[in-house]
Amino acid sequence: MASLLIIVFLSHVVTYLINTIGATTVDNLLWLLYLKLPNNTSRTAVEQRRLKGEVVQLKREMKSTSSQDEFAKWAKLRRRHDKAMEEYEAKNKALGKHKGSFDLTVKSVRFFSTTGLKFFLQFWYSKTPMFELPRGWVPWQVEWVLSFPRAPLGTVSIQVWSGVCTTVVSLAGDALGVVIQSLILKMTKRGVARTSEGRPSQPMALKKEL
């Protein structure tokens, strides 16, 4: 069941990455990528941004135009502003509905591809051994624990393998995070040291002047 071993492990990796990055961040990134595709929603987003810029520009022109001295021009700008604002609000409302539907779809897919998938695999393959242990390698009490709840004795169940994957992925991810942070800190210190070496200190400059 090598393929099942890999599927369970990858599902835990994906879950860890989503939890580390943040589900909201992932949703926003997917939304931005979705808006890059040629579809009606992306065209609505482009039109919404255009109308927003037009509203801001007209508002600036209205502020720079006197409503008393240049009433005709100001009234014309006001009508254009109100019309653009109305269109912008309509596009913004439509885009908000699209984003709500998109977020719901993404959350559903994320649940069924991570948590839902793990629950299904653990239920469907509860009697399927992930791999067999060498005979007599561990006491039978340990074999019973490793095969819990329904796998044959002397094998490792999918529930136990899933727990091992959770622990290993979490520890590996935390260790990798510490390594990356230490590397970033070292690079930052080196950059500061090079900057300080390239600049003469103030006491030395004063000595040269004296």
Curated annotation (Swiss-Prot):
Lumenal side of membrane: 1-4, 132-155
Alphabetized Gene3D superfamilies for the sequence: Helix hairpin bin
Pfam family for this entry, one: CHD5
Coiled-coil residues: 43-97
Annotated compartments: Endoplasmic reticulum membrane
Recorded GO CC terms: endoplasmic reticulum membrane; GET complex
Segments passing through the bilayer: 5-24, 111-131, 156-172
GO biological process: tail-anchored membrane protein insertion into ER membrane
Keywords: Coiled coil, Endoplasmic reticulum, Membrane, Transmembrane, Transmembrane helix, Transport
A Gene Ontology molecular function term of the record: protein-membrane adaptor activity
Cytoplasmic side: 25-110, 173-210
Function summary: Required for the post-translational delivery of tail-anchored (TA) proteins to the endoplasmic reticulum. Acts as a membrane receptor for soluble GET3, which recognizes and selectively binds the transmembrane domain of TA proteins in the cytosol.
Subunit structure as annotated in this protein's UniProt entry: Interacts with GET3.
Cross-referenced PANTHER family: GUIDED ENTRY OF TAIL-ANCHORED PROTEINS FACTOR 1 (PTHR42650:SF1), TAIL-ANCHORED PROTEIN INSERTION RECEPTOR WRB (PTHR42650)
Assigned protein family: Belongs to the WRB/GET1 family.
Classification via HAMAP family: Get1
Designated name of the protein: Protein GET1
Organism in which the protein naturally occurs: Uncinocarpus reesii (strain UAMH 1704)
Name of the coding gene: GET1
